[in-house]
Amino acid sequence: MTAIAPVITIDGPSGAGKGTLCKAMAEALQWHLLDSGAIYRVLALAALHHHVDVASEDALVPLASHLDVRFVSTNGNLEVILEGEDVSGEIRTQEVANAASQVAAFPRVREALLRRQRAFRELPGLIADGRDMGTVVFPDAPVKIFLDASSEERAHRRMLQLQEKGFSVNFERLLAEIKERDDRDRNRAVAPLVPASDALVLDSTTLSIEQVIEKALQYARQKLALA
């Protein structure tokens, strides 16, 4: 009988620290990593590379079904590998973002990408970063964590990130955008942003990233009986 690879799902709102936590856990456990938030951008970029019409659901479905993508975390840096090429920077362009919002609107594309995401489940295990990993994509995952933080703290973190890149930021506007996105994500009809009933809700508002990583790893190892 083939062993089923364990999955640790990390869900939560934007700015809670999911990406940093997932990279740290994947490196600590030497497990595979899935950044579900990047999947639609990767598909959009693949479509642009292969001259596939991003407005054609029929053309996109086979591309989504066989998307050749890997996520590799090295020293805290995430590399997105599409067809053997590092596209970490390329998927962040506005052209790709616009195309990603188009491809994400197609139900059959979303279904194909759901199956593709589940295919990341390989031994020794998978860390899945997203918003509906524990509720929709891997409902049977043995370890589910919902990482949260206050909207004010998430806005503050985002402001610091943008300021470090040289951008001028209005905190109140940033906070309003985050609250609006939270409201939209939590109240949408399909896969709303809610903790799975069996998830550990971890509030990172007053914790350092090191404390968050320590708590999450301790919980995961306890649930999985890992040394």
From Swiss-Prot:
Classification via CDD domains: CMPK (cd02020)
Annotated binding of ATP, by residue: G12, P13, S14, G15, A16, G17, K18, G19, T20
Record's GO cellular component terms: cytosol
Location(s), subcellular: Cytoplasm
Pfam families xref list: Cytidylate_kin
Catalytic reaction(s) noted: CMP + ATP = CDP + ADP; dCMP + ATP = dCDP + ADP
Organism domain of life: Bacteria
Keyword terms of this UniProt record: ATP-binding, Cytoplasm, Kinase, Nucleotide-binding, Transferase
Enzyme class, spelled out: transferase
Main localization, broad class: cytoplasm
EC number: 2.7.4.25
GO term, biological process aspect, one: pyrimidine nucleotide metabolic process
Example GO molecular function: ATP binding
InterPro entries for this protein: Cytidylate_kin (IPR003136), Cytidylate_kinase_dom (IPR011994), P-loop_NTPase (IPR027417)
Family that this chain belongs to: Belongs to the cytidylate kinase family. Type 1 subfamily.
Protein name per UniProt: Cytidylate kinase
Source organism of this protein record: Shigella sonnei (strain Ss046)
Gene that encodes it: cmk
